[in-house]
Amino acid sequence: MSTFPAPVLGTPLSPTATRVMLLGAGELGKEVVIALQRLGVEVIAVDRYADAPGHQVAHRAHVVSMTDPQALRQVIEQERPHVVVPEIEAIATDLLVALEDEGAVRVTPTARAAHLTMNREGIHRLAAETLGLPTSPYRFVDTEQALREAIDGGIGYPCVIKPVMSSSGKGQSIIRSADDIAAAWRYAQEGGRVGAGRVIVEGFIEFDYEITLLTVRARGADGQIVTQFCEPIGHRQVDGDYVESWQPHPMSPAALQRSREIALAVTGDLGGLGIFGVELFVAGDQVWFSEVSPRPHDTGMVTLISQVQNEFELHARALLGLPVDTRLRQPGASSVIYGGVEARGVAFEGVAQALAEPGTDIRLFGKPESFAKRRMGVGLAVADDVDQARAKAARVSQAVRVRAGA
């Protein structure tokens, strides 16, 4: 096993500074910035739009098209970070691989992990074909006709279609019959992160529930890399986007063990240091791999209130080579606060009411612009059990009202 010298952290804005650059400064990136700031790290946040949540708390902020390799290289060379942390998928990952190969920068967890997980084809082929992990049956297709042939050739109905590059459920839909194919194809072409293109069609698995298993690769006190697991997180999605999550989700011992084995296999192959959000389907004691994100996961926002160290603190500590603590503090839940209006500079009402109940908290992300279904915040709650925590978190999010500013 590899060894590693004890980490030394510097002073921000000084010659000794430990510099970390985040590529992506949304609500998840913002929490990573805060976690790094608490450890005395100098943080540079990059996003495609001004005043992103992470921009508001970083030492320096840049507005850059992160899919433009020339622009991305320029900002990295300008800031000279010790570590680059991809916080979204829409990045010129070929450049990150090249820079890491050159020894110019360290990418967390690795540039290869960022590259493979930026589209569903890379990670599905790794999981199913290289590692032999159980997945839903799938095919990759480039035309509507090829989609029809894939479904008729064995995928069957119902099935799920997704762009190979998309996030938050964009472009994703269920095809229940041949009558749905044309509309589903158009929706997938509109929802892809880089426009029209390749899609994945997956056979439907009759699962009981799906979980996110936050998996952390970090160095122990002896410097060796060890893999640790948070308690499983259950979540509910609408149109492919998470609306609530809770921890822990009850599982059979056999299903939990199999989930950990799958997560260990895929994160071990991706390598590096940091947290991974491993998404799994579960039916009884059977477990199937779904997806993995080599970064904090949106469903993991429940850990802001449920764990000793939340997922953002775990990621920050791990990428710096520090030991981590994945223990659950108390059963908890999160519930999304949606914008509900289309406006800039919105105001939030009902915050005092939302926080009046003991064991609750909120995060307001500070996004400069609201849309009807844009996540603008999250309600958080802990309780004696998950069901009580879910009910409390829902009351928190429902109490907060978003209105257009004056």
From Swiss-Prot:
It comes from Bordetella parapertussis (strain 12822 / ATCC BAA-587 / NCTC 13253). Residues 125-320 form the ATP-grasp domain. It catalyses: N(1)-(5-phospho-beta-D-ribosyl)glycinamide + formate + ATP = N(2)-formyl-N(1)-(5-phospho-beta-D-ribosyl)glycinamide + ADP + phosphate + H(+). This is Formate-dependent phosphoribosylglycinamide formyltransferase. Involved in the de novo purine biosynthesis. Catalyzes the transfer of formate to 5-phospho-ribosyl-glycinamide (GAR), producing 5-phospho-ribosyl-N-formylglycinamide (FGAR). Formate is provided by PurU via hydrolysis of 10-formyl-tetrahydrofolate. Mg(2+) binds at residues 279, 291. InterPro entries: ATP-grasp, ATP-grasp_carboxylate-amine, ATP_grasp_subdomain_1, PreATP-grasp_dom_sf, PurT, PurT/PurK_preATP-grasp, PurT_C, Rudment_hybrid_motif. ATP binds at residues 120, 162, 167-172, 202-205, 210. One of its GO terms (molecular function) is magnesium ion binding. Keywords: ATP-binding, Ligase, Magnesium, Metal-binding, Nucleotide-binding, Purine biosynthesis. The gene is purT. One of its GO terms (cellular component) is cytosol. It holds the Pfam family RS_preATP-grasp-like. It comes from the Bacteria.
